[in-house]
Amino acid sequence: MAKDIDWGNLPFSYMETSKSFVATWKDGAWDEGTLTSDHTITISECACVLQYAQTCFEGLKAYTTSDGKVVTFRPDLNAERMESSCKRLEMPVFPKDKFVQAVIDVVKANLDYVPPYGSGATLYIRPFMFGSNAVIGVKPATEFQFRILVTPVGPYFKGGVKPIKVRISDRDRAAPHGTGDIKAGLNYAMSLYNIVDAHNCGYAENMYTDPATHTYIEETGGANILFVDKEGTLLTPKSDSILPSITRRSLITVARDILGMKVEERRINKNELEGFVECGLCGTAAVISPIGQVDDHEKSIKFPSGMEEIGPVMKKLRETLTGIQMGTVKGPEGWVVEIK
């Protein structure tokens, strides 16, 4: 029985649900993990996560499909990406098979909170891990919690698929040879000042360039970037400091193998933007959000697709991927995992 929620007007914000999942690493091993209705966490004031930001997270969604099934999208890739984050941050890896099963179990325990098909809302799934024991010198924790919370959410950007305006930031999202390619909490803490400043200046997001030369486009604070050139080629920036987006990876497959598009992953100089016809953000939260204008200090780059409608290529990509997720378009084997 679905909850009495105004699904069509949900904000992108946290709502407490029935159950979360929690597992604990102690004495060199994970316990079995369990579902819990306690959504609070009690830790030492000197916990490693509070003192030294030893934490990473993931993001994925559960959906109701056109035929009434509840599914999630490629959770195995979230497990693999979290493994990379954990290794980089000196944290224990939560096994891939247990990660996927925990996702299934926590969604199953919160089926009342999965929005109905066609509502535009989804159940956001947030796996995360943190160092939980007290640490006063700079060193890794020895005890950890792996948790998964879920919450129903509306669109990430209020306008849905209406184009947004972004700016090229003077600040860096990540350091060269740093942690830009993992989903570490510290990366997002670094972007908070920038995103608040961007919003205060009338922009939806910051577009970051490479930290070494500030010449090549990388990504925004919370999503990867896509471009379309005049020949209809899908372009995406290539860099070692970009988070490997599962949505971007999926869109590249959709473009190349389903829509028959040419795809290039390469370094993209910011001076090339004026020659592109479409631009968009992609990620779990936004799927694809079109960009209509990029401001680079005094210069404004306005894409031919405009500020009113999503461009035709981005629209087709978005419709195809969301169609696969919602069960109206046949996708590659194993992409959609049914919750049953």
Predicted regions and their residues:
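Extended, Lys/Arg-enriched charged tracts that mediate electrostatic binding to polyanionic substrates
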Residues: 116-130
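Charged, gly/pro-rich active-site loop segments
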Residues: 106-120
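Helix-start/capping segments and mature chain N-termini
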Residues: 1-106, 128, 135-340
